[in-house]
Amino acid sequence: MQEQKLQENDFSTLQTFKRLWPMIKPFKAGLIVSGVALVFNALADSGLIYLLKPLLDDGFGKANHSFLKMMAFVVVGMIILRGITNFISNYCLAWVSGKVVMTMRRRLFKHLMFMPVSFFDQNSTGRLLSRITYDSQMIASSSSGSLITIVREGAYIISLFAVMFYTSWELTIVLFIIGPIIAVLIRLVSKIFRRLSKNLQDSMGELTSATEQMLKGHKVVLSFGGQHVEEVHFNHVSNDMRRKSMKMVTANSISDPVVQVIASLALATVLYLATTPLIAEDNLSAGSFTVVFSSMLAMMRPLKSLTAVNAQFQSGMAACQTLFAILDLEPEKDDGAYKAEPAKGELEFKNVSFAYQGKDELALNNISFSVPAGKTVALVGRSGSGKSTIANLVTRFYDIEQGEILLDGVNIQDYRLSNLRENCAVVSQQVHLFNDTIANNIAYAAQDKYSREEIIAAAKAAYALEFIEKLPQVFDTVIGENGTSLSGGQRQRLAIARALLRNSPVLILDEATSALDTESERAIQSALEELKKDRTVVVIAHRLSTIENADEILVIDHGEIRERGNHKTLLEQNGAYKQLHSMQFTG
């Protein structure tokens, strides 16, 4: 069985960006427009600096007032150009990043929906929520914010180099010596940022998981006075995240001054060389020197920005790696092509053995039984004996590696997954309802397939109509997340109505009434009997009174069938079933 834990591959920044590029490519028009705007923005900035030479040498140096008046309009025009191009570049890149993040989230969401149950057994909900929300948003930093900075500041530095080289190539050569040193420094810092960013994202997942755990289990926390335990746990993970965040800040804060010091050394060198006779006598005017010196001063800002954006870009790339690690995992195997519309419902287990991932002990050991179409088999036994595992295998929530499970004589692995699950309806102890209307919950995933009359008929058969009609908007009432506004019995009846509407030939009742009180159980027992009619039923029961009429009862213990027969014959055997029966009915 394939391991489904998240393991991030150590790809380089370039390799990761190459994988991200297919998501960016459909929106490359926005990148091109933004790139052109950023180039013009950089030219406007460097052009303003270059204007210092004619202003000083020709305007003020020669007292040319008409020239100075003309230059005033030129400066205003360049500043307007700078503002327009800045807006265009920011808007286009924000549009691109929004599209990329949306695409990634949609791919991730769709991929997660097709992952096997074993994947969710091994990865916490909080961590996965963090991946979809926090990590996917981090991609915006690498596809928008950081790209704006990289392109704009990169173009600005190149244009400043061009201005300096055109004005005085001798002084500009100094920067060609210092440049590679800064590049090497940025490369070294990139690796540090990448590692720290991965650690920070892991901490965010743990923080989300801790929060989600407390919110979902809030009643348990209150009941057992676990506030201190949860507070200590949350304080630990939040402090761990704070420490990792401070490491990022420290690395960023150290890298900036180092780059600034190296750049200032280049500036001081230029200032010193300008005083030497070789350059001073080479027609270096006040305007030319001012342009070179101002260009070098102006270059400090983009150099600092490029160093700072490196941390942002590496965070985005680390987030991409994490998300690609999920997308690289294989979804549920769905190699079958057989379709039964509908199946007759004959179910058979042949020598089935199964173990959960990461466990050596078998959950099921050589299980064999058959259920003729339209008959009911009940599974009873202690908690952890393997009853629910059998139910999960019928719907292929887990795949077996030994034995066969047949539906109408066909191996369930030969069925198309969608068709297999269309032929099986599950009503479990843990009912999940969606934050939607009553009608949409009953007709979940098939709202267009069923009419309102069919939905009402299913609700009536499930004995749910009596409470639905009392709701403010009746079937159009939104019931809140997981049906929080409903009682346990009401939620269970909606689950039964959902199964009735689906009308599948195979029905699995996984302790469907064990969480209810006796009165609620009695209220829905008639609904369950209606649901069982003309169906092959697998019942997992805690209360033996609910399965006395089953055609066959299997007593499961430690993953094996210990006893089998109907209620009467099992009582006569005076074995494990008789012992369970005596415990429930005689105390």
From Swiss-Prot:
Principal location class: membrane
Catalytic reaction annotation: ATP + H2O + lipid A-core oligosaccharideSide 1 = ADP + phosphate + lipid A-core oligosaccharideSide 2
Residue stretches spanning the membrane: 31-51, 68-88, 145-165, 166-186, 259-279
Any one GO molecular function term: ATP hydrolysis activity
SMART domains: AAA (SM00382)
GO-annotated biological processes: transmembrane transport
Domain ABC transmembrane type-1: from-to ranges: 32-315
Domain of life of the organism encoding this protein: Bacteria
Subunit: Homodimer.
Protein name, UniProt field: ATP-dependent lipid A-core flippase
Organism this protein belongs to: Haemophilus influenzae (strain ATCC 51907 / DSM 11121 / KW20 / Rd)
